[in-house]
A protein has these predicted regions:
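A short acidic, glycine/proline-enriched capping/turn motif at secondary-structure boundaries
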Residues: 75, 84-86, 122-124
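Short secondary-structure transition/capping motifs
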Residues: 51-58, 90-93, 139
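Aromatic- and Gly/Pro-rich amphipathic surface segment
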Residues: 32-67, 72
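Active-site region of glycoside hydrolase catalytic domains
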Residues: 1-46, 89-90, 99-466
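A common structural microfeature
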Residues: 9-11, 59, 76
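Glycine-rich, proline-tolerant flexible connector loops at the mouths of alpha/beta enzymes
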Residues: 81-95
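Generic alpha-helix structural propensity
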Residues: 57-64, 72, 81, 96-103, ...
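Catalytic domains of carbohydrate-active enzymes, especially glycoside hydrolases
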Residues: 61-82, 294-298, 358
Length: 466
C-alpha cells in the first residue's frame, strides 16, 4: 500500500457544533433555538424521538473530551457558539453563557488544543425566527450585532473565526426541500434566505475587521467561512442542457459563496439566470457595498459526497417554481448505504484543483469529512470495541487525495474530521454514528474508543497516510 506524506505544518482536528454537542438546552439563560422548538412541538420527527436536548452531553464532559482529542494526536478542533446561549432576547450578553465559553476556551488552551470558533450552525433563536428569520433584514442586523458581541467578548482568546457553517444548507433544507422545520417547498424564498445570509456574513466580516483594527481581536487572528463545497458532475458525454444544469447547481451551491468570500460579489450569471426564471431577490440600494466587505482570510471546505446532476425533465417543479437540474445517478457509484451518500474521495482533489484555477490565492482546509454508519453497535467485538475498519478506509482514501492536491499546489492547510466523538445529528439524531469515539446513550453518554481511534492517532502524529 502506497504511503502519502502530509506537510509537517498540516493540522489535524475535530469538527463539532454547539447545538449538536452541548446539551443543557434550557439552562444558564439559554433561549430556545429552532431545534429545541421543533423537538418540543414534534418529537416524532426525530429518529427514535431523540430531540435536541442533550447533544452528546459535552457541557458535562468537555474536560474528558478535550483530553481525548489531545490523546488522539489532534491539535485543533472546531465548535460553535450558540447565538441563543450568548445573547438574551434583547441582544444583551448573557453572562452565564459567556462564562461557559470562556471556560471552554481556557480548558482548550490548557489541553493544548487550538479552538476554531464558528458563529452559526443552523441554530436560529426561535424568537428571531418568529420575526421572519433569514427572510427578514431585522434578523440580518441582529446577526451582525451578535457577531460583533462575540468578537469583542472572546477576541483575545480565539485565533480562528468563522461566520457560518454551510450557509447553503438552511435555504435548501428549511425552505426548498421541506426537510427541516418549517418544512417549506419554495425555491424563491430559499434564494431570499440565501441572499440575506450573504449580507449577514458580509456585515459580520465588516464588524470583525473593525474590531481587529481597534485591537479587540488578537493580532494573529483570521476569519473565514465554512461551506459544503461539493463538486458538481454530470454524464460522461453530456448535452448542453446537462452542462447548463451543472453551471446553475454549482453556481448556487458553490460559486455563490466562493465569489462572495474572494471577490465580495455574487456570480452575475447565476443572478441573471435566477431573474430569468422569475426569482426576485430582495436587492436594496447599498447592498453591493455591503457584499464587498465579505472577503475573508481563508475557507473551510466540508466534503462528504459529490453532487451529480443532469438536465431537468421540467424547468418548473411540482410547486410551480424554477427547477434547474435533476439528480443524475452514476452507475459506478460506491455508496454508504447507511446515509445514502456516494463515496467519492477524488472530490476533494477536484475542489483543490478548482481553487488553483479559479481562486488561486485562497487558503483552505477540510473542515468536515466523515462517514456515518447506522446500527454501528452491531460491529462490537467480544471486548466491547466497535470494529470500524470502514472508517479507516474512508478517511485514508480522502487524505490520499488531499495529499495529491497539495503536491500539485493546492493550499490546503489541515483536516478536521466530523465528528471525532459521536454526536447528535439533527432530525437523524444518533441514527448514523460518525465518531472515532463511541457515545453510549444507554450508559450515561459514556465514551469508548472505537478500533479506528488508534489509526487516527498514528496519522495525526506522523502525518503519514498509509
Amino acid at each position: 500500500m502506497a504511503q502519502y506524506q502530509l506537510p509537517d505544518d498540516f493540522f489535524f482536528g475535530a469538527a463539532m457544533s454547539g447545538p449538536q454537542t452541548e446539551g443543557q438546552w434550557n439552562q444558564g439563560g439559554k433561549l430556545e433555538n429552532l431545534w429545541d422548538t421543533w423537538s418540543i412541538q414534534d418529537l416524532g420527527s426525530f429518529y427514535n424521538r431523540v430531540g435536541s436536548y442533550a447533544g452528546n452531553d459535552f457541557m458535562a464532559k468537555y474536560q474528558e473530551d478535550l483530553r481525548t482529542m489531545k490523546d488522539l494526536g489532534l491539535d485543533t478542533y472546531r465548535t460553535s457558539i450558540q447565538w441563543s446561549r450568548l445573547l438574551d432576547a434583547d441582544g444583551n450578553l448573557n453572562e452565564e453563557g459567556a462564562a461557559w465559553y470562556h471556560e471552554l476556551f481556557r480548558a482548550s488552551r490548557e489541553a493544548g488544543l487550538e479552538p476554531f470558533v464558528n458563529l452559526y450552525h443552523f441554530d436560529m433563536p426561535t424568537y428571531l425566527f418568529d420575526r421572519g428569520g433569514w427572510e427578514s433584514r431585522e434578523v440580518v442586523e441582529a446577526y451582525a450585532h451578535y457577531a460583533d458581541v462575540a468578537f469583542r467578548e472572546f477576541g483575545q482568546e480565539i485565533k480562528y473565526w468563522f461566520t457560518f457553517n454551510e450557509p447553503i444548507v438552511e435555504p435548501e433544507q428549511r425552505y426548498q426541500e421541506g426537510v427541516w422545520f418549517p418544512q417549506l417547498h419554495d425555491f424563491s424564498r430559499a434564494r431570499t434566505v440565501q441572499y440575506h445570509i450573504s449580507l449577514a456574513h458580509a456585515l459580520a466580516v465588516a464588524n470583525y475587521r473593525r474590531a481587529y483594527d481597534e485591537g479587540a481581536v488578537r493580532a494573529d487572528a483570521k476569519i473565514g467561512m465554512i461551506n459544503c463545497f461539493t463538486p458538481v458532475y454530470t454524464k460522461v458525454n453530456p448535452s448542453e442542457a446537462d452542462l447548463e444544469a451543472v453551471r446553475m447547481t454549482s453556481g448556487i451551491n458553490n460559486r455563490w459563496w466562493l465569489d462572495l468570500i474572494t471577490k465580495g460579489e455574487l456570480p452575475a450569471d447565476v443572478l441573471e439566470s435566477l431573474a430569468e426564471g422569475g426569482v426576485k431577490l430582495p436587492f436594496r440600494a447599498g447592498d453591493q457595498e455591503i457584499l464587498k466587505q465579505g472577503v475573508v482570510d481563508w475557507l473551510g471546505c466540508n466534503y462528504y459526497h459529490p453532487t451529480r446532476v443532469q438536465a431537468p425533465a421540467s424547468k418548473i417543479d411540482q410547486y410551480g417554481l424554477p427547477h434547474f437540474a435533476d439528480e443524475y445517478v452514476w452507475p459506478d457509484a460506491v455508496m454508504n448505504e447507511s446515509r445514502g451518500w456516494e463515496i467519492y474521495p477524488q472530490g476533494l482533489y477536484d475542489f483543490g484543483m478548482d481553487c488553483i484555477k479559479n481562486y488561486p490565492d485562497l487558503e483552505w482546509f477540510v473542515s468536515e469529512n466523515g462517514i456515518g454508519i447506522m446500527d454501528e453497535y452491531k460491529n462490537r467485538d467480544a471486548e466491547g470495541t466497535i470494529q470500524d475498519d470502514y472508517r479507516v478506509d474512508f478517511v485514508r482514501q480522502h487524505l490520499e487525495w488531499v495529499a495529491k492536491a497539495i503536491a500539485e499546489g493546492a493550499k490546503c492547510r489541515g483536516y478536521h474530521y466530523w465528528a471525532v466523538i459521536d454526536n447528535w445529528s439533527w432530525a437523524n439524531a444518533f441514527k448514523n454514528r460518525y465518531g472515532f469515539v463511541e457515545v453510549d446513550l444507554m450508559d450515561g453518554y459514556k465514551r469508548r474508543l472505537k478500533k479506528s481511534a488508534a489509526w487516527l492517532k498514528q496519522v495525526a502524529t506522523t502525518h503519514v497516510v498509509d
